[in-house]
Amino acid sequence: MVEKAQLMDEKAIARAITRISHEIIERNKGVENLVLVGIKTRGVPIANRISKKIEQIEGTKVDTGDIDITLYRDDLEKIHVEPVVKGTYLDFNVNDKTVVLVDDVLYTGRTVRASLDAIIDIGRPKSIQLAVLVDRGHRELPIRADYVGKNVPTSRHEIISVSLLEIDGEDSVTIKE
């Protein structure tokens, strides 16, 4: 796998998080009854960053949790290994809330579909929105993001790699081939 280009550096990621945070506040006319749910693994630190940014802007803390979709995947029988379940952490109720699912990359839509199933098993939200750092296209399901940090048209053989300080020690988005 060869790195073709860096698409976003630390500053570009920070700007995208700030913009997404403002868009979430504007679209929802504030943050009342709003919760953020990061999809493990890299959606979690992105959700936490959005939460901190919203708190800076609005002066209100937004409940933030994370969800593990391992057992909701539709490809478990294809991977032929025992799934490693990392656990879901939501210390709040999602009933009648606006849930913003947060992930790093939107590709086929299958991760988001599994996340929707997991959220609906937990409760009945008023609505579910989707925020992603990168949308690379190639959807296999009728799913679209409400908030996008960067749209990056790719070919199917290219890979978008997101590195985050909290997990990888640096912030960057690169495209590899």
Swiss-Prot record:
GO terms (BP aspect): DNA-templated transcription termination
SUPFAM superfamilies, per database record: PRTase-like
Reactions accelerated catalytically: UMP + diphosphate = 5-phospho-alpha-D-ribose 1-diphosphate + uracil
Pfam families recorded: Pribosyltran (PF00156)
InterPro entries: PRibTrfase_dom, PRTase-like, PyrR, PyrR_bifunctional
CDD domains recorded: PRTases_typeI
Entry keywords, A to Z: Glycosyltransferase, RNA-binding, Transcription, Transcription regulation, Transcription termination, Transferase
Family: Belongs to the purine/pyrimidine phosphoribosyltransferase family. PyrR subfamily.
UniProt name for this protein: Bifunctional protein PyrR
